[in-house]
Amino acid sequence: MKASLLKKLDVLSDRYEELTALLGDAEVISDQTRFRAYSREYAEVEPVILAFRDYRKVQADLEGAQALLKDSDPELRDLAEEEVAEARERLAALGDSLQRMLLPKDPNDGRNVFLEIRAGTGGDEAAIFSGDLFRMYSRYAERQGWRVETLSENEGEHGGYKEVIARVEGENVYAKLKFESGAHRVQRVPETESQGRIHTSACTVAVLPEPDEQAAIEINPADLRVDTYRSSGAGGQHVNKTDSAVRITHLPSGIVVECQEERSQHKNRAKAMAWLAAKLNDQQQAAAQQAIASTRKLLVGSGDRSERIRTYNFPQGRVTDHRINLTLYSLGEVMEGAVEQVIEPLLQEYQADQLAALGD
């Protein structure tokens, strides 16, 4: 393991001892805000320190076994050789585990997300594919035990959506979906194509982490224009009786959000405001993410919405992720919700990139 990483672990060990003392301090215990903060930090640090202690113990065992290699007793030397080999193997495994524990954590990984899918080039076929993508992500969410709530939808003339916006709620949603942002291209023969020609169309996907309520971005009410209108979504006859749908325009940025899925105007407004906060937060972080991508060339995590990230070729049953040159011939399974077949290799590639940069 790199000396710089061992130094980090030594510093973390000192912090662990400090946290242990703080959590036993009467003054801290009486201050619930500080106590909760230290408890969260302790819970994050403890597994790393326990693993580091195991690493140090195995390291000591290895040194002891290596010393026995010089013993005059041949049987003892043979036994020591076995112990050295075993200790080296365990040390390598523990070192690898510790490195992964030290990887910088994305503070948004545990967040819920707003999922935006928009039809791009390709007209009706692009709208139909938007619907297919939304169904794919909904099936994937179901497999993960997540909840999908549609906020806004603009249906295509021949099926699918020109645009569909949803909130996805559950455990580690952003961690799993954050690399789905970008342009998704489809190649297939449309049902209306009589000559059997393959058409190419595209959709864009944006995955925005929902800001934490306590760290939510401040929005000046004077910067907003709020319009209400009659919903055209679900809800039976009620939707035509009241102006329950809400459209909010953020004047400084020009960002427009709308929500029409709830019968209550108040609920629609609250959801639209949460979505607006996510979009403004995303806008603020875009420059920083571009800087990181340019310095470390994190192609997997660039998040560029215009970047073509994936192609779905229906005649060949093929799905290709262009960022990591991954090609799978299980398109049917992926479209039915087995998106983990693409997501897991992406996460592994990103983690490998982080490991390569760790300790630099």
UniProtKB/Swiss-Prot annotation:
GO CC annotation terms, alphabetical: cytoplasm
Gene3D superfamilies the UniProt entry points to: 3.30.160.20, 3.30.70.1660, 6.10.140.1950
Entry comment on modification after translation: Methylated by PrmC. Methylation increases the termination efficiency of RF1.
One MF annotation (Gene Ontology) recorded for this entry: translation release factor activity, codon specific
Keyword Secreted: no
Signal peptide: none
One Pfam family hit: PCRF
Subcellular compartments: Cytoplasm
Keyword Cytoplasm: yes
HAMAP family: Rel_fac_1
Function, in words: Peptide chain release factor 1 directs the termination of translation in response to the peptide chain termination codons UAG and UAA.
Record protein name field: Peptide chain release factor 1
Organism: Pseudomonas paraeruginosa (strain DSM 24068 / PA7) (Pseudomonas aeruginosa (strain PA7))
Gene: prfA
